[in-house]
UniProtKB/Swiss-Prot annotation:
The modification N5-methylglutamine is found at Q106. Coiled coil: none annotated. This is Histone H2A-beta. The modification Phosphoserine is found at S128. The [ST]-Q motif constitutes a recognition sequence for kinases from the PI3/PI4-kinase family. Keywords: Acetylation, Chromosome, DNA damage, DNA repair, DNA-binding, Methylation, Nucleosome core, Nucleus, Phosphoprotein. The nucleosome is a histone octamer containing two molecules each of H2A, H2B, H3 and H4 assembled in one H3-H4 heterotetramer and two H2A-H2B heterodimers. The octamer wraps approximately 147 bp of DNA. The keyword Ligase does not apply.
């Protein structure tokens, strides 16, 4: 028998698989790891930290893009523009809290009119008291 655990046959070489593919992510785990090491955030970076961070970033991006796509569809547009990102973030309570101090270029403002500035309702809608 030849040396090895496969029982005589030569071991079939597996193709290399990225850490992103192993974790089932679209965001690059290797790049996040490199940025964590080069950013001087800590002397050492564990193996699980870049995977977790890439997963969180991917989730946030997917959440924002889904809401922005809904805002674009509401405005009868097929392309997401910064205005749609602004509306998506500001209309979502948790994202607005997370990105409260972020300025989005060309985002505009969320439409809002104070109730005191609206014209008062006239008596047309009230039921008549005729007998």
């Amino acid at each position: 028998m030849s040396g090895g655990k496969s029982g005589g046959k030569a071991a079939v070489a597996k193709s290399a698989q990225s850490r992103s593919a192993k974790a089932g992510l679209a965001f690059p785990v290797g790049r996040v790891h490199r940025l964590l090491r080069k950013g001087n955030y800590a002397q050492r970076v564990g193996a699980g930290a870049p995977v977790y961070l890439a997963a969180v970033l991917e989730y946030l991006a997917a959440e924002i893009l889904e809401l922005a796509g809904n805002a674009a569809r509401d405005n009868k547009k097929t392309r997401i523009i910064p205005r749609h990102l602004q509306l998506a973030i500001r209309n979502d309570e948790e994202l607005n809290k997370l990105l409260g101090h972020v300025t989005i270029a060309q985002g505009g403002v969320v439409p809002n009119i104070n109730a005191h500035l609206l014209p008062k309702q006239s008596g047309k809608g009230k039921p008549s008291q005729e007998l």
